[in-house]
Amino acid sequence: MALLEIHDLHTFFKTKKGIVKAVNGVSYSVEPGKTLGVVGESGSGKSVSAMSILKLLDGNGYIDSGEIIFDGKNLADVSVKDMCKIRGNEISVIFQEPMTSLNPIFTVERQLSEPFIIHQGMNKKEAAVKVVEMLKDVRIPNPEAVAKQYPHQLSGGMRQRVMIAMALA
């Protein structure tokens, strides 16, 4: 049984010039323990597909039709409140360019702490300890120091590792 199944997904955006069909009939599945690479030209809908799965579309974007079955639930029908519990806890995405996903005004620790505080009820001190553990898990050298840094102070590869740690959190 697939962990994630996308059936005939259609994601559209309302614009002043009309409707833009960003994702038009995409279907695929991912089995537990397997990896799926989504490849396509720039502007072909890869990122919009991922944003649709996580329900992170801009205000003018919407899922017009299709199903996003994750762990037996159709995420297309899940409320915003329930999706906040699922997103970052049960399902995550690691974006290609981490600098656009990390907030430049917050430290790595602050950003990585959020899932532990929100989803696991940890206090800030407990979450800070867990952040260092996560940074160690993705083989970031000197994780205590890196946790106190801002994204712009890290190399692209280090930012990517931070995003992997965030997805695993």
For the regions a protein language model found, what residue spans apply to each?
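ABC transporter nucleotide-binding domains
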Residues: 1-169
